[in-house]
Amino acid sequence: MALLQIAEPGQSAAPHQHRLAVGIDLGTTNSLVAAVRSGETATLPDELGQHSLPSIVRYTQDSVEVGALAALSSAQDPQNTIVSVKRFMGRSLADIKAGEQSFPYEFAESENGLPLFVTPQGQVNPVQVSAEILRPLIARAEKTLGGELQGVVITVPAYFDDAQRQGTKDAAALLGVKVLRLLNEPTAAAIAYGLDSKQEGVIAIYDLGGGTFDISILRLNRGVFEVLATGGDSALGGDDFDHLLQAHMQQVWQLSDIDSQLSRQLLIESRRVKEALTDAAETEAKVILADGTELTQIVTKAEFDAMIAALVKKTIASCRRTLRDAGVTTDEVLETVMVGGSTRVPLVREQVEAFFGKPPLTSIDPDRVVAIGAAIQADILVGNKPESDLLLLDVIPLSLGIETMGGLVEKVVSRNTTIPVARAQEFTTFKDGQTAMAFHVVQGERELVADCRSLARFTLKGIPPLAAGAAHIRVTFQVDADGLLSVTAMEKSTGVQSSIQVKPSFGLSDTEIATMLKDSMKYAKDDIGRRMLAEQQVEAARVLESLHAALAKDGDLLNADERGQIDATMANVAQVAAGDDADAIKLAIEKLDEQTQDFAARRMDNSIRVAFKGQSIDNI
């Protein structure tokens, strides 16, 4: 029996109708397209029989070259040949320039600070470049399948933020293609293996591609895929192995001042050497300089292993952290799935096997497994499998919440909550007559806003001018299947509402996520103390403001001595609240409350007298 039928409304397929949909692995280094045909899932080759399309785009005066054709010209025209554009998606130009890696491109800056590539065809942004990579994949699929696609599932790294995910959707939109869903790459691999191998239990997905590393811990049970935790490094991949090899060759050949053309030639040779060392103990590296000089050197597997050992060790450290987040041990992991071309590197497989204590799964081509999983998901979403037994649950990496008085964070959606998800919480006004409320959406695990990441701000206006605490504002957080966040605030009595969709301009790297998680544990005790202090300070401010209003209205109910005692106690509360002793503030508030109980009773009696003045018993 189906646990969940994943299909858009109105998309249930008729028995005689097969809808066309594909899965696309939009990779940093290479991209693939796959489809389900006659019950079999496979990647689709081009006219030359090539399954993978190099994620490379070259702009010339008269044309746009994509894939292998662009790769052939990359060494001669590096400035106009854009490689690994995925690394630029959702990042600011300032962030790119501040990075350690240099690029041969000429950049311009958009109005919102995002990078623009200056090409012979004008300025283009990463979204447009990504669309050029998608274009031949879509065309290939429609030609192979014999019709127009009704939707695609595109995979993205698990740590892509909202801006990066939206950019990927926008790239497809430029081509008029409907995106059924964005799917995390490790999760796509889990779908491929889950259906083919019928695995149950805890599975680790080790995904080392050209530009990113993702580790996901999933629990598979009776066709249910639940992501327990995710981790990784959005700036670590096979490209980094290539750059280390390139630096090694430059050092051996004593090449100091090199132009962009030679740099690209060295990079291409580095990739060839890396691939050759997958099966050989050593190989010869060779480049030809502009003057015709031929340079050669022997690179051994041992040398290459030494170069990349630190990077591979970083991936294993991420695995260890993510297992801890998931609350499982290596002994509980039944299988480790290898994803991405860089997992072919022998040292990677050796270290993964040593860490998890068992050989990793490689029965599905690690270069194609993500596209295959995406194709399976696309086939379900487009309506071809109405009785699907596949339930997919992803998680959010960091808690989402709202700033409250005192700079505190009220978490609405907790970290590692499965998505899609909707959570709601009620808030109220702080002051009498308050007609608007500002909302600050934050992300993180700390107790104070200052220690969390700001996502967005918006304001709800039109709140009825009631007494403090009388208005009820319902705030709803909704995270869709693609990880995009919508926040809505609604005043319950009037229905007035305001909302915002969070699309950050700047990416959040896994390194920042790891740092935020570490800090939340490191400063947990201090944070609780700071929160308790802030809560008492807010309560003191609320009590004093309320009492000031009461005295202004009904102060004549007190004699001079009583008023003097209350004023003195109020002054003491204000003085203590300015300090850093939460317990002292609490005691001061309690003393003030005790001292003003008689005043509160008189106010109540007076209010009753005023309300019933001039009325007879029969009218009450």
From Swiss-Prot:
Going by the entry's taxonomy, the superkingdom of the source organism is recorded as Bacteria
PANTHER family in the record: HEAT SHOCK PROTEIN 70KDA
The protein's name: Chaperone protein HscA homolog
Instruction: State the HAMAP family in the record.
Output: HscA
Family listed: Belongs to the heat shock protein 70 family.
Query: Which SUPFAM superfamilies does the UniProt record give?
Result: Actin-like ATPase domain (SSF53067), Heat shock protein 70kD (HSP70), C-terminal subdomain (SSF100934), Heat shock protein 70kD (HSP70), peptide-binding domain (SSF100920)
Is the keyword Transport assigned to this protein? no
Biological process terms from the Gene Ontology for this record are:
iron-sulfur cluster assembly
This protein's UniProt keywords: ATP-binding, Chaperone, Nucleotide-binding
Entry's Gene Ontology molecular function annotations: ATP binding; ATP hydrolysis activity; ATP-dependent protein folding chaperone; unfolded protein binding
**InterPro entries recorded:** ATPase_NBD, Heat_shock_70_CS, HSP70_C_sf, HSP70_peptide-bd_sf, Hsp_70_fam, ISC_FeS_clus_asmbl_HscA
Alphabetized NCBIfam families for the sequence = HscA, PRK05183.1
Q: Which Pfam families match?
A: HSP70
The entry's function note states:
Chaperone involved in the maturation of iron-sulfur cluster-containing proteins. Has a low intrinsic ATPase activity which is markedly stimulated by HscB.
